[in-house]
Amino acid sequence: MKQSHFFAHLSRLKLINRWPLMRNVRTENVSEHSLQVAMVAHALAAIKNRKFGGNVNAERIALLAMYHDASEVLTGDLPTPVKYFNSQIAQEYKAIEKIAQQKLVDMVPEELRDIFAPLIDEHAYSDEEKSLVKQADALCAYLKCLEELAAGNNEFLLAKTRLEATLEARRSQEMDYFMEIFVPSFHLSLDEISQDSPL
């Protein structure tokens, strides 16, 4: 039986830091970001289903979000100002991402490939799935900005403003609900969010 390097590669997502051009109070890696995006994407899907008549598979959305940046283990996390410097660079980077996604899929044993390929290849996502994962991705980047700003790091002021515009462009009922119910707590200290806890 042939060995696969697939999970050994994915394990290295924890070595790739996000926001590489920014001074960070706390460094965030791609692995922990992916977990947070999965949790938020799952919540958005659940909110959509429960509150707004949606019919999406929240567990699949969480899985897609877990793998949404998997190709960065081969490409690295390119800083946003570089990635979107102009349309040509953005287009070329998308092509590089596609190649990296295919390379990861090719690492999976053939008998399992049909399970993992639709998780890694974003072209297999439905429009609704892609929208929910992108909303969650932007929300988590926004939450990172709030955390950095709360810690006194003004380096993230412009990023927060840019992400507010992104969130507005991707706005949905489920995102509005999440922003109203869950996001305000990110402005609070540990003591403040623990006041109601019996522990």
From Swiss-Prot:
pH dependency: Optimum pH is 8.0.
Annotated phenotype, changing D137A: Shows negligible enzymatic activity
Summary of subunit composition and partner proteins: Homodimer.
UniProtKB keywords: Cobalt, Copper, Cytoplasm, Hydrolase, Manganese, Metal-binding, Nucleotide-binding
Cofactor note: A divalent metal cation. Highest activity with Co(2+), followed by Mn(2+) and Cu(2+).
Assigned EC number: 3.1.3.89
Effect of H68A: Shows negligible enzymatic activity
Cofactor(s) the protein needs: Co(2+); Mn(2+); Cu(2+)
Biological process, per Gene Ontology: dUMP biosynthetic process; pyrimidine deoxyribonucleotide salvage
Annotated site (Appears to be important in orienting the phosphate for catalysis): R18
Localization of this protein: Cytoplasm
Protein name (Swiss-Prot/TrEMBL): 5'-deoxynucleotidase YfbR
Function of the molecule: Essential component of the deoxycytidine triphosphate (dCTP) pathway for de novo synthesis of thymidylate. Catalyzes the strictly specific dephosphorylation of 2'-deoxyribonucleoside 5'-monophosphates (dAMP, dGMP, dTMP, dUMP, dIMP and dCMP) and does not dephosphorylate 5'-ribonucleotides or ribonucleoside 3'-monophosphates.
UniProt cross-references to InterPro entries, sorted A to Z: HD/PDEase_dom (IPR003607), HD_domain (IPR006674), YfbR (IPR022971), YfbR/HDDC2 (IPR039356)
Superkingdom, taxonomy of origin: Bacteria
